């Protein structure tokens, strides 16, 4: 248990970090800290490391260098030193460095998790609830640090990073705590006890687009159900994962229960998926990468949970409020620079109202300010040069295949020569055979398709290899519900409903398998055991 005095020291040190604009804290590639204001550094050391010299401090800095992994409750050097530059997508400058792990680092983390599982799996619901409460308390202290890291690592505007990206982290923690308190782990049916037990060591592989959201919606239910774990965050956006790890360490997560190893997919990700002592792999990312995870996991017949790509339809029914529905649809696609797997990227409108819809979409897209994510812009950059090139190529492909360029288009926005910025783009008169209607673009690009009948709209919506999400807007509630019930997607949003963290999240078809969020997420981390004769009386 962390004492109140330690929490006070930590809060004071965090404030000192925020207030000091004179710190010189760039770490060199060996992980040693450069000189800075001594008092602030001493305070940071006292609160953040508990006297341990191997704790990587997080503070206001010109360069974030995170060169150690978190294994068995300690910050440790990689077995084979190797570093990677992390690029700020708004400036194209190096923002920091991380160490890249190896299969040997993964094995050390898995062995620590395996040892910890023996005791943590036997912890009580009350003990795990208390742990989640401590994590939530620590997260509140570090909320703004998390948000700032997300802005720097993947370009989310400050407001989005604070109010959505970082907020989702605490939302999933609170949801897991709520579910845990009432969750039924065992039930007697006749003389047979049906018991749900933690599955074991979990390998968690998370993406860069909603970094803490995806970490939290895996780690929180894993902790709540009594599992231990090894996390590999995206090497493209790793800063927020480091702060997340500091939060768990400060909250007193038992040694070995949570472990962090940075690295890339082909090395660290593959080692996690194929490790014989990992019992479950939970992966969020592209369908292509998900296939590799499943292939690596197959020889050990472990459980594989995946949340993959999407090409979500957004049906606007003939009796819908067209201005409201189109406006909401455009803004939803452009949110987070289009880098959301459940973005409603295929808007279906009645063909006779196509021109009206295009005019509304153009006005909304052109009203979105693009620019420095720390300056109040509505949309920041996409995450990397590779993503920028892919998005630009697909925009050009859409135009070549006959789509009408309604707004945006190829090239960077005017005045934004530095940074991976994309114009908010709307393509009209798209048909479902076009490349832009089939492939996940993962950028701020909306395709608008026309339909003649509601039956045709449903057929177009379902004509995709994906099935993560779908959206329907309509005026008559029962008719709108009937359309929603026929869409082949894991989550269907009716008339712009608010997010629900208790609602299961996951996909049909090539969008993955299994479910995250809320009570349904717990089942992914549990095995079911039947104990026959448990309730029988003695002969």
Question: Which residue stretches match the model-derived regions?
Answer:
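Compositionally biased, intrinsically disordered low-complexity segments enriched in Pro/Arg/Gln/His
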Residues: 2, 6-9, 17, 33-35, ...
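Terminal low-complexity tails and localization/encapsulation signals of metabolic enzymes
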Residues: 6, 46-97, 130, 134, ...
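Conserved C-terminal structural/oligomerization subdomain of aldehyde/semialdehyde dehydrogenase
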Residues: 24, 91-97, 278, 315, ...
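Residue-level signal for inorganic ion chemistry
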Residues: 92, 128, 150, 173, ...
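Short, well-ordered beta-strand elements within core beta-sheets of diverse protein domains
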Residues: 95-101, 116-122, 169, 204, ...
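Long amphipathic alpha-helix in the N-terminal Rossmann-like dinucleotide-binding domain
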Residues: 111, 133-144, 156-183
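Rossmann-like NAD(P) dinucleotide-binding subdomain of oxidoreductase/dehydrogenase enzymes
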Residues: 140, 185-324, 376, 451
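ALDH superfamily catalytic-core signature
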Residues: 280, 288-431, 494, 538
